[in-house]
Amino acid sequence: MEITKIGNGNEVTLKLKGCLDTTATPDFAAAIEGTAGAATLVLDMSELEFISSSALRQLVATKKKRGAEFKIALLGMNEVVREVFDVTGLDEIFEVR
């Protein structure tokens, strides 16, 4: 799993590459913490192959912790990853670009 942070300020992008499984979730959580202060977190999932339920929980917890004004946008999901968000209903909570 590779996570690359792009940008600073109000909108920060995390580019995700590989499999975001349970073992990668702590690194994902740390990367998200590194975006504190941003009003919008964009997750570039164009090279993401898999996302685990623990990573989904991390996203929900982050949204809840940072409040209603904080936005999480999902970008470039493949069919497999998109289906996870559709089935869980999280595509209704996060902005899909």
Give the residues covered by each predicted segment:
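STAS-typified acidic loop motif
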Residues: E2-F28, F50
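Amphipathic alpha-helical interaction surfaces in cytosolic regulatory modules
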Residues: T22-I93
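Short acidic-hydrophobic, aromatic-tinged amphipathic segments that line or gate anion-handling sites
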Residues: E95-R97
